[in-house]
């Protein structure tokens, strides 16, 4: 661990992406492209070797939205959508060291959801881990400095264009918590 990690107990470099679970990823992508000016830049699904879900990565400014649908009704993503409707499932944060950040969060009381794992392909190595946030929302810690491909292994680039409406970045996130459920 370097000195910067000691000085800041949870060094977050920024929001990497916000993932929405939706009933129809292709339709939702069309909506966010044409209604809000997000450009579809990457795709993952059966055509890229991912058999259980389909995802589109959308960008505008420094904002990345990951729009994901399940391909079977018994998938956890389908259960999320049945319970909540289309909604935010993951607010992923870019960090310098995903494993260290995960362990530190769990040490401080966070509930671990996904232990640190490595994803790799010919474009390098991506590291990630996840903790519970609130309700059924999670926070994924993403370490990207060793990865130089299109978003993540299993994604291929898209060449679509969209008319940006000028959104720059996500500057904060607000959670809606059910009455009586906030500590």
Language-model regions, residue ranges each:
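Short, glycine/acidic-rich beta->alpha junctions
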Residues: 10, 50, 83-86, 97, ...
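Core segments of cupin and vicinal oxygen chelate
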Residues: 10-13, 19-64, 107, 116-122, ...
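N-terminal beta-strand motif that seeds the catalytic metal site of vicinal oxygen chelate
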Residues: 1-26, 88-91, 148-182
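Short, structured motif recognition centered on aromatic/hydrophobic residues
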Residues: 15-22, 38, 58, 65-67, ...
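Hydrophobic or amphipathic alpha-helical targeting/insertion segments
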Residues: 32, 81-142
């Amino acid at each position: 661990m370097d000195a910067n990690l000691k000085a800041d107990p949870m060094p977050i470099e920024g929001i990497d992406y916000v993932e929405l679970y939706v009933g129809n990823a292709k339709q939702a992508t069309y909506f966010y492209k044409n209604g809000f000016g997000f450009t579809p830049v990457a795709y993952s699904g059966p055509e890229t070797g991912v058999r259980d879900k389909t995802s589109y990565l959308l960008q505008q400014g420094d904002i990345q939205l990951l729009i994901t649908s399940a391909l079977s009704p018994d998938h956890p993503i389908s259960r999320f959508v049945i319970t909540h409707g289309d909604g935010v499932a993951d607010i992923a944060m870019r960090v310098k060291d995903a494993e260290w950040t995960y362990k530190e969060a769990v040490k401080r009381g966070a509930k671990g959801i996904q232990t640190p794992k490595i994803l790799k392909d010919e474009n390098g190595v991506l590291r990630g881990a996840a903790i519970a946030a609130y309700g059924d929302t999670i926070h994924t810690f993403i370490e990207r400095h060793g990865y130089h491909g299109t978003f993540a292994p299993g994604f291929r680039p898209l060449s679509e264009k969209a008319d940006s409406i000028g959104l720059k970045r996500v500057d904060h996130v607000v959670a809606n918590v059910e009455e009586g459920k906030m500590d």
